[in-house]
């Protein structure tokens, strides 16, 4: 936490950060807990404005675990992005135009993914990689899933400005 704080303070006095909030509003443990803890901790730092981007409102009980603060806001897709397919597209690509409109300077993909094209958008990006079990033990997964996860992982590595690895 101190390292992240130091990096942000060096960059400038005020910064707008976008966080991938899908797991924050949908997962009670694991990735969701990680995201809620990070969002709450970052919200306590002066000079940060946080925008939590989620494809929908998810579960009230999880969303309510995120502190209500002046510098923390949830953002959801609108219009054509309301269908399941639309939400998936928004999260993987359409979110970029919304972040540009919102003035996001840094986006953190909390669950190992970044929107396609974020590098070209001018928005700096950080991604947290939690595990690569699908690569180490592909026998635990359907072969199609391994291919999808591998493609997404490699794409994310190409897009990311910084990578946080929190497991072996």
Language-model features: locations:
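Carbohydrate transferase catalytic cores enriched for Leloir-type hexosyltransferases
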Residues: 1-168
């Amino acid at each position: 936490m101190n390292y992240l704080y130091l990096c942000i303070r060096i960059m400038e006095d005020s910064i707008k950060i976008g966080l991938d909030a899908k797991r924050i509003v949908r997962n009670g443990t694991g990735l969701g807990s990680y995201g809620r803890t990070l969002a709450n901790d970052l919200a306590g730092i002066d000079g940060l404005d946080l925008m939590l981007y989620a494809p929908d409102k998810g579960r009230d009980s999880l969303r309510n675990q995120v502190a209500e603060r002046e510098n923390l806001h949830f953002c959801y897709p609108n219009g054509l992005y309301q269908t399941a397919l639309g939400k998936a597209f928004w999260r993987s690509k359409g979110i970029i135009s919304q972040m540009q409109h919102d003035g996001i300077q840094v986006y953190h993909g909390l669950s190992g993914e970044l929107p396609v094209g974020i590098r070209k958008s001018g928005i700096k990006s950080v991604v947290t990689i939690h595990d690569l079990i699908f690569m180490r033990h592909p026998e635990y997964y359907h072969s199609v899933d391994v291919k999808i996860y591998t493609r997404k992982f490699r794409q994310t590595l190409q897009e990311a400005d910084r990578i946080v690895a929190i497991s072996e």
